[in-house]
């Protein structure tokens, strides 16, 4: 009888424990928790529209950055193949001009006058160079003159950036030519990958030191991507794709002008043109329709009121037609003086 009683007691304890567990875990026994008036206060409302919008922005930002890094890595990989091909071609070209004159082979070279000037200029810089790092820096000045203009966009460029988001890289294909020239001048045409990496780091330090002297003026700033709005969704997407490749508003203006007025820059006729007609100074006004396109693309990207943006845009157009910095060769003497110091 005593044993049976103990068993019953144990069974009763188990039943009560299970009932209590179900009572605690069941919402039916605690109507206050299920009541709509009960709100669990949190710092972030997970299901709110505002939170969803923030998450969408973060996701888009991450996707854009991931896409950018992927494209950069693809370009770098393609540049390695380009380096090998370019070096073989450069060595053959050098051998060719030892046995013949440039005048003899000029007809077979596309844009032979520009090619001849480029070869002549970079040879002059190479001959004057006494230090590999200074030679690379001088050739960057020569081949990327538009980056070293008044907007100081070179601040955002590095040869081997620590962050591919914070800094852009110089064109790997132009860097290949610079590398070949340095290997010819200092390393007897031997491929020195490790040495090139060290030189790149030294040049980046020079760029950092020079960057500390300047800032990008506020008038050249661009809006954050999410704040850029065109006249339509299609326009907005197109403008954002243009802006992705730019550091400053001046660079964006230049990019659009080179597309719309390509023939003028290619022929050299750009020298006779300005934003408006200027009979007294002998300048021809640019096509109004094309200028409107420039304004439609550039103004939505500038962090100022539209009337101010229009004035600044006009100034940048005139400035670029006065001195289009994408045309290389104008600063040859500056580059030679730099490597000679």
Swiss-Prot record:
Q: Which residues form the BEN domain?
A: 112-222, 233-328
Membrane: present as a keyword of the record? yes
Annotated GO biological processes are:
symbiont-mediated suppression of host innate immune response
Q: Where is this chain's protein located in or outside the cell? A: Host cytoplasm; Host nucleus; Membrane
Keywords in alphabetical order, please: Early protein, Host cytoplasm, Host nucleus, Host-virus interaction, Inhibition of host innate immune response by virus, Inhibition of host RLR pathway by virus, Membrane, Repeat, Transmembrane, Transmembrane helix, Viral immunoevasion
Membrane topology type: Single-pass membrane protein
Residues spanning the signal sequence: none
Extract the PROSITE patterns matched here: BEN
Q: Which InterPro entries match?
A: BEN_domain, Poxvirus_E5R
Query: Could you tell me which Pfam families the record lists for this protein?
Result: BEN
Any one GO CC term of this protein is: host cell nucleus
Q: Which GO terms describe its molecular function?
A: DNA binding
Residue ranges of the TM segments: 7-25
> Which superkingdom is the protein from?
Viruses
**Quaternary form?**
Interacts with host CGAS; this interaction inhibits CGAS-mediated type I interferon response.
- Described purpose of this protein according to its UniProt entry: Major early protein present in virus factories. The presence of BEN domains suggests a possible role in organization of viral DNA during replication or transcription. Plays an essential role in the inhibition of the cGAS-dependent type I IFN induction in host dendritic cells. Mechanistically, abolishes cGAMP production by triggering host CGAS degradation via a proteasome-dependent mechanism.
Into which family does the record put it?
Belongs to the orthopoxvirus OPG067 family.
Q: What is this protein called?
A: Protein OPG067
């Amino acid at each position: 009888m005593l044993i049976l009683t103990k068993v019953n007691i144990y069974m009763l304890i188990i039943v009560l424990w299970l009932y209590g567990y179900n009572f605690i875990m069941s919402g039916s026994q605690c109507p206050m928790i299920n009541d709509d008036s009960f709100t669990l206060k949190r710092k972030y409302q997970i299901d709110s529209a505002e939170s969803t919008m923030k998450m969408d922005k973060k996701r888009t930002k991450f996707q854009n950055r991931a896409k950018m890094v992927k494209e950069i890595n693809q370009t770098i990989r393609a540049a390695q193949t380009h380096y090998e091909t370019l070096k073989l071609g450069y060595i053959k070209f050098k051998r060719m001009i030892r046995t013949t004159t440039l005048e003899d082979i000029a007809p077979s070279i596309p844009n032979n006058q520009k090619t001849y000037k480029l070869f002549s200029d970079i040879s002059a810089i190479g001959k004057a160079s006494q230090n590999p790092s200074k030679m690379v820096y001088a050739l960057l000045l020569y081949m990327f003159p538009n980056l070293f203009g008044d907007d100081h966009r070179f601040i955002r460029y590095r040869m081997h950036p620590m962050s591919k988001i914070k800094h852009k890289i110089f064109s790997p294909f132009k860097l290949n030519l610079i590398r070949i020239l340095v290997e010819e001048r200092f390393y007897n045409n031997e491929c020195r990958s490790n040495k090139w990496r060290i030189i790149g780091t030294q040049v980046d330090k020079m760029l950092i030191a020079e960057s500390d002297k300047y800032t990008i003026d506020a008038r050249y700033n661009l809006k954050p991507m999410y704040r850029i709005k065109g006249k339509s969704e299609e326009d907005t997407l197109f403008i954002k794709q243009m802006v992705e490749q730019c550091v400053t508003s001046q660079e964006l203006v230049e990019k659009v002008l080179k597309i719309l007025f390509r023939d003028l820059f290619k022929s050299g006729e750009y020298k006779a043109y300005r934003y408006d007609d200027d009979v007294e100074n002998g300048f021809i006004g640019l096509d109004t329709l094309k200028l409107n396109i420039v304004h439609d693309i550039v103004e939505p990207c500038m962090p100022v009121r539209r009337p101010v943006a229009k004035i600044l845009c006009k100034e940048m157009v005139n400035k670029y037609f006065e001195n289009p910095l994408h045309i290389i060769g104008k600063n040859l003497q500056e580059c030679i003086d730099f490597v000679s110091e």
